[in-house]
Amino acid sequence: MIKIEDAQKKQATVIARLIMEAMNHECCQWFAGPNHTLEDFHQLMTRLVEHEDSQYSYLNTLVAITETNKIVGICVSYDGAKLRELRKAFIKGALEAFGRDFSDMEDETTAGELYIDSLCVDKSFRRRGLAKQLLEATIEKGRKMNLPTGLLVDTRNPQAERLYHHVGFVYMGDNQWGGHKMKHLQKPL
């Protein structure tokens, strides 16, 4: 039996690994730059998950966890109105760790939605309905906040897009993030 529950700070290392998988390693390496490794980026992400004031904070994360306490999935979400405030920790961390300034990064969300930043299920636990469970728990979180739930999906990931539509997300418009064409989808209240 797998449960969906609020993340804990002590789970930061695993949560960071799954966030990086959701971002994809090519994107993570781009953020780290040519003089740093994916392990360097993982260290930064782990610190950001441990922070309470980061978009990747454990406080913004739901985990799918097995009976043996293995984390097999994550969903990171936050109020879109808080993106710029929450992103400051990433901008500061990347500048300190990699000497790279991302303060001019485009916003991927705005006020008026609970934004799903990262969703990932461990490869060995896929095709069991865990992503759907994580999505449904996050949508419920949005309902409690009186916000629709939004996300960006890469146009090159039709399988994920099918899942989102199946759960009730609707197309809101085109977007771009990290050099990729994306679709903005939203699950109405």
Model-inferred region functions:
Residues 127-140, 165-166:
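Conserved acetyl-CoA-binding loop-helix of GNAT-fold acetyltransferases
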Residues 1-13, 21, 27-30:
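Conserved N-terminal entry element of GNAT/NAT acetyltransferase domains
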Residues 78-114, 118:
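Conserved acyl-donor/pantetheine-binding loop and adjacent beta-alpha core of acyl/acetyltransferases
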Residues 112-114, 142-154:
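Conserved GNAT acetyl-CoA-binding A-motif
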Residues 63, 70-79, 115, 120:
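Conserved beta-strand in the GNAT
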Residues 48-63, 81-85, 115:
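A short helix-loop-beta-strand connector motif used in the catalytic cores of GNAT acetyltransferases and
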Residues 26-49, 60, 95:
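Conserved GNAT-fold acetyl-CoA-binding loop/helix
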Residues 80-81, 150-152, 165, 170-184:
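Conserved catalytic-core motifs of GNAT/GCN5-like acyltransferases
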